[in-house]
Curated annotation (Swiss-Prot):
The natural substrate for this enzyme may be peptidyl-tRNAs which drop off the ribosome during protein synthesis. This is Peptidyl-tRNA hydrolase 2. SUPFAM superfamilies: Peptidyl-tRNA hydrolase II. The gene is PTH2. Residues 46-58 have a biased composition (Basic and acidic residues). Present with 2190 molecules/cell in log phase SD medium. Keywords: Cytoplasm, Hydrolase, Isopeptide bond, Ubl conjugation. Residues 32-45 have a biased composition (Low complexity).
Amino acid sequence: MEKMTVSSNYTIALWATFTAISFAVGYQLGTSNASSTKKSSATLLRSKEMKEGKLHNDTDEEESESEDESDEDEDIESTSLNDIPGEVRMALVIRQDLGMTKGKIAAQCCHAALSCFRHIATNPARASYNPIMTQRWLNAGQAKITLKCPDKFTMDELYAKAISLGVNAAVIHDAGRTQIAAGSATVLGLGPAPKAVLDQITGDLKLY
């Protein structure tokens, strides 16, 4: 009788254990499937919204406008600065009143730096062409500095002062396809030029 009771109890315990394991496995599989279904549904929904134009990628949008940027420059003869000793650098002056995102600012600074380099280094027919200053800048590590500018009025003053001192300069105007009005002056590029001369122009500005 005791053997039958022990055997019966063992069978019940074994059945209970098996049931518990089955329940746990079933719950785990159900949770996993539900999670996968939710992820798949979210992915499909996002894909559909992107196709319908409801979602967009700000980075791609900013990059797509890059070819439409324009610069304002005067062909400035800067060879008179070649004999000034010391560090040669480029300054990128960023307007603060436009509310540009960091990505937007980075793109505009790239435009300004490339524009300044093209003016001073790529076309011997231009008055702004200055291979000596370019080489000094390249040999010293292409130093660049980013500075804050409060508004368009201040930027115009800085640009005029750069021209009067014979410093290579370019103002970048936005295409107006994403964040700000078309034609807005966003970044002023200065140089490459001796730091001593740039400080006369931007000495009162704060670092960005």
